[in-house]
């Protein structure tokens, strides 16, 4: 289990994200799409179109991490873009 700092803000990128993007591509999405600093200690969550893959981008003050979760059954429930 990865322990994130208490009180860390979590941002969900609405809609589907191109899951071919890696750390740098997602960091660019955070800057351009969400208007946030990807190095600010917040968690940024992205979901692929089929809904079975989720990526979390996080900078812990030392370096950037990219966590990936793929589920075998069902889908991640995700908000639609406003």
Model-found features: residue ranges?
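Polybasic/polar functional segments that serve as interface/processing modules
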Residues: 1-82
């Amino acid at each position: 289990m990865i322990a994130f700092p208490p009180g860390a803000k979590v941002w969900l990128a609405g809609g589907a994200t191109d899951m071919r993007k890696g750390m740098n591509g997602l960091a660019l999405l955070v800057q351009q799409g969400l208007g946030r600093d990807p190095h600010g200690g917040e968690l940024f969550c992205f979901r692929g179109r089929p809904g079975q893959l989720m990526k979390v981008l996080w900078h812990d003050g030392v370096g950037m991490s990219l966590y990936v979760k793929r589920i075998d059954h069902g889908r991640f429930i995700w908000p639609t873009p406003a």
